[in-house]
């Protein structure tokens, strides 16, 4: 199948003729038909082989088109094979577009994405996009996540709520975890987190609302939300970087309070909402009131003094992320305060696993913020029996 490609490639640019291009297009058409046929039969190995050949041909043709501005004059009228490429290609009138449509079709086949959407993207972007799309489709599933990632990371430092979504994966996790937590709230969460949070996460207010909804949702489905939030703990790290988040978090908390169910619980939620949407959920599940109170007290302290800690803990954060699963104080040696807090969290029903990360991210930061500065080890050592046990550290 690659004979034409092999024979045409060595030729110089000046030797590219309409016959060569037409031959390549015919070969690509045949390759596409073979790919579709094998795909219908479930022969993935053959599909992959033909797709690689088709990809090379398309890259070659795209290179020719890019290097030869007059290539349009050499291209034949739209070949009939374009009619077989699918609904997206039926409306295309240029051979170069046909090439793109073919490329997008092969990409769509390999990635399972709708060819029409790919076709449109390629056609609009031009020949140079052909090679790009070859790889893009394969990465689209992940890029869709990572695409918002940059927004998250940007928003993360800017807004408190963002931290949760600060990481590209965070947003996804949140939405997924939320899905597990609650179908309806989750959809809201996802939308807010994915859209308003990302785009407006920087604003923070929307994010707060979104998070507050998260917290509220978390309360509604505390157990499940806890599960969903665990992934968030890792996300939390994104917040580490920004002290703003903490400040915003306080605001967040305020909003959360209003949004949250009870003043005490809302506190906990708000607390976490900042970066601890999970916290809020879990808190509600834990022993919301006591935690909440401790949060209120410690929250403010941590916020105020904890910013510097944030940066410190950020390092811990990363450790915490890995260590989150182990809440042991030892895990967060650098974040000694974390451990204590984590322990406190840990004591609180199993949510700790989530908290650990969060605590490191924020809960710890709070507790450690205040105490870490003064005596992280001490805090560590004293997880503080606090009625909340979890937040004992905070209060101290």
Curated annotation (Swiss-Prot):
Location of this chain's protein in the cell: Nucleus; Chromosome, Centromere, Kinetochore
Q: Which organism is it from?
A: Homo sapiens
Give the start-end ranges of region N-terminal auto-inhibitory domain.
1-148
Query: What's the superkingdom here?
Result: Eukaryota
The protein's name in its UniProt record: Calcium-responsive transactivator
Q: Does the keyword Transmembrane apply?
A: no
Found, by tissue, as follows:
Ubiquitous; with lowest levels in spleen.
This protein's domain notes? The MFD (multi-functional domain) domain is involved in transcription transactivation, nuclear body targeting and dimerization.
User: Does Cell membrane show up as a keyword for this record?
Assistant: no
Subunit info?
Homodimer. Dimerization may be necessary for its function in neuronal dendritic development. Interacts (via C-terminus) with CREBBP (via N-terminus), EP300 and SMARCA4/BRG1. Interacts with the nBAF complex. Association with CREBBP facilitates transcription while the association with SMARCA4/BRG1 suppresses CREST-mediated transcription in resting neurons.
One Pfam assignment? SSXT
Q: Which GO terms describe its cellular component?
A: cytosol; kinetochore; nBAF complex; nucleoplasm; nucleus
One example of the protein's molecular function in GO is: transcription coactivator activity
Keywords, sorted A to Z: Activator, Calcium, Centromere, Chromatin regulator, Chromosome, Kinetochore, Nucleus, Repeat, Transcription, Transcription regulation
